[in-house]
């Protein structure tokens, strides 16, 4: 129940350099203010959804992945380009380098996980073309880091469960070391 339409303009604002409707911005601080005002919990006793890979990983048997292209749709294709000096991927969308709206820095990632999931158009009577995605069960995917990729299995037993990412020898991705 927090959204940029019903809240006031002090919590959400439009970035004039971007095209509407995808130009509404906010901050973590503003979201927390709204959550506190509405009496929402802002802490959790659940463990983190992701176990981040913090050590350097060498996928020695991996496939070269200097450029990773992800077609979300015909008009929305994301590309990640690997920089061997920084050991990070830079994100491009619609053939333009993406930058942080506040800092102007390139959007980058050390690790990329791609998960192939089934999606379909919702039959909700409104015919808005909204999509539903099946994120539970075992799915195929890729773990990408340091210019290489390996196939993985993505396992999620329920909607509220944490997704577990494993290589094809059943080893959790966060346990793959140099």
Language-model-detected regions and their locations in the chain:
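A surface/extracellular/periplasmic glyco- and lipid-processing/surface-interacting theme
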Residues: 1-178
């Amino acid at each position: 129940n927090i959204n940029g339409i019903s809240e006031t303009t002090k919590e959400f604002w439009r970035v004039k350099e971007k095209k509407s409707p995808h130009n509404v911005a906010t901050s973590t601080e503003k979201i927390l203010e709204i959550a506190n005002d509405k009496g929402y919990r802002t802490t959790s006793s659940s463990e983190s959804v992701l176990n981040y890979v913090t050590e350097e990983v060498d996928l020695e048997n991996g496939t070269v992945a200097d450029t990773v292209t992800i077609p979300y749709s015909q008009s929305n294709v994301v590309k990640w380009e690997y920089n061997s000096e920084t050991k990070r991927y830079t994100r491009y969308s619609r053939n333009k380098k993406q930058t942080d709206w506040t800092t102007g820095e390139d959007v980058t990632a050390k690790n990329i996980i791609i998960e192939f999931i089934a999606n379909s158009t919702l039959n909700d009577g409104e015919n808005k073309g909204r999509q539903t995605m099946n994120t539970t069960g075992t799915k195929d995917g890729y773990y990408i880091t340091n210019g290489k990729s390996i196939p993985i299995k993505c396992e999620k037993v329920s909607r509220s469960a944490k997704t577990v990412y494993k290589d094809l020898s059943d080893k959790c991705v966060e346990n793959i070391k140099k």
